[in-house]
Design a protein with these regions (language model features):
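Extracellular adhesion/carbohydrate-recognition regions
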Residues: 3-85, 133-137, 142-145
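C-terminal, surface-exposed recognition/capping segments
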Residues: 90-154
Length: 154
């Protein structure tokens, strides 16, 4: 066995440090654990899917309820609130488009939010192309109802 010099140790140390730095830059695989959840669905309701928080953790499950009503933005929001439900927000509208394209192809619908630039307008989702834009709140569009199921940890 030959003698080991300080220079050899420093060289190997530098090489090993470079390997560690390269390893740390590699993408890391992660696991997402879906805990058992029982989601009660009323008659005619359909589960659209999960909505996640910015950190990737589960926020809630979106449920599309049966029945709809056409009307102005305010009328649609009153209709859904009167049922104890919500008008879908912009993010939820995109999930509905992905989960139920056949349902969404039936016509444009109001979304929950007023347009931030002009209170006479609100966001809607056009299902011919699936894009979201603003429309005068007085225009009659579809109103669909959703609810948000938040699994509890007991």
């Amino acid at each position: 066995m030959s003698d080991v010099t300080l220079e050899q140790l420093k060289s190997e140390h530098a090489r090993f440090g470079a390997l560690l730095a390269q390893f740390e830059k590699q993408p890391v695989t992660t696991e997402y654990v879906i805990e058992r959840a029982v989601i009660p669905l009323p008659a005619g309701a359909r589960l659209a899917g999960p909505i996640f928080k910015d950190d990737g953790s589960l926020d809630y499950y979106l449920i599309l309820h049966a029945g709809e009503e056409s009307g102005s933005h305010d009328a649609v929001k009153a209709y859904t609130a009167g049922r104890g439900l919500k008008t879908p927000n912009r993010r939820e509208g995109r999930l509905l488009q992905a989960a139920f394209p056949e349902f969404c192809a039936e016509g444009s619908m109001w979304l929950e939010e007023e347009h931030e630039d002009d209170s006479a307008y609100a966001w809607y989702q056009n299902y011919g192309g699936g894009y979201q834009s603003r429309y005068l709140k007085s225009v009659e569009l579809r109103g669909v109802a959703v609810s948000r199921f938040i699994p509890s940890v007991i």
